[in-house]
């Protein structure tokens, strides 16, 4: 009882520096009403600026550009063959796609089947083949 009375006295009596603590806790805080932000640019001007922003196009290897034509001529002069390049790319991209081939599909055999040491994978070895058919 004494403790309760002591707490009430502490909370209700005004403090010398802060005033009445209980009253301060219970009274509503008065917040300043938010004012409209001041905009320095009109909406039409802002929209005009934002609409004018366009993403720059990527630098594509456009063959109509003269420097790309020059590079391409240099590649051809150095021995670049576009058809062979496309064939090689399609071959290497499709290497792992089909697994239904008889020789495994993924491995291209560069070994000689009549050599003393054969392929490491026994399932890819053609039993009884006396000819390296990969050469044909």
Swiss-Prot record:
Top-level taxon: Eukaryota
Compartments, as annotated in UniProt: Secreted; Cytoplasm; Apical cell membrane
Coiled coil ranges: none
Signal peptide region: 1-19
Keywords of this entry: Cell membrane, Cleavage on pair of basic residues, Cytoplasm, Membrane, Secreted, Signal
Stretches that traverse the bilayer: none
Pfam families: Augurin
Cysteines joined through disulfide linkages: none
Primary localization class, coarse: secreted
GO cellular component: apical plasma membrane; cytoplasm; extracellular space
One Gene Ontology term from the biological process aspect of the record: cellular senescence
Xref: InterPro entries: Augurin
Propeptide, residue positions: 20-56, 121-136
Family: Belongs to the augurin family.
Biological function: Probable hormone that may attenuate cell proliferation and induce senescence in the central nervous system.
Name this protein carries in UniProt: Augurin
Organism per entry: Xenopus laevis
């Amino acid at each position: 009882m004494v403790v309760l009375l002591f707490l009430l006295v502490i909370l209700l009596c005004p403090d010398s520096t802060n005033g009445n603590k209980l009253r301060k806790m219970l009274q509503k805080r008065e917040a300043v009403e938010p004012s409209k932000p001041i905009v320095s640019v009109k909406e039409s001007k802002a929209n005009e600026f934002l609409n004018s922003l366009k993403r720059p196009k990527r630098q594509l290897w456009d063959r109509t550009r003269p420097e790309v034509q020059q590079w391409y001529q240099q590649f051809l002069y150095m021995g670049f063959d576009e058809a062979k390049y496309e064939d090689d790319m399609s071959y290497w991209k499709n290497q792992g796609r089909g697994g239904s081939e008889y020789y495994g599909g993924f491995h291209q055999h560069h070994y000689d089947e009549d050599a003393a040491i054969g392929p490491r994978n026994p399932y890819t070895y053609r039993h009884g083949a006396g000819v390296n058919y990969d050469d044909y």
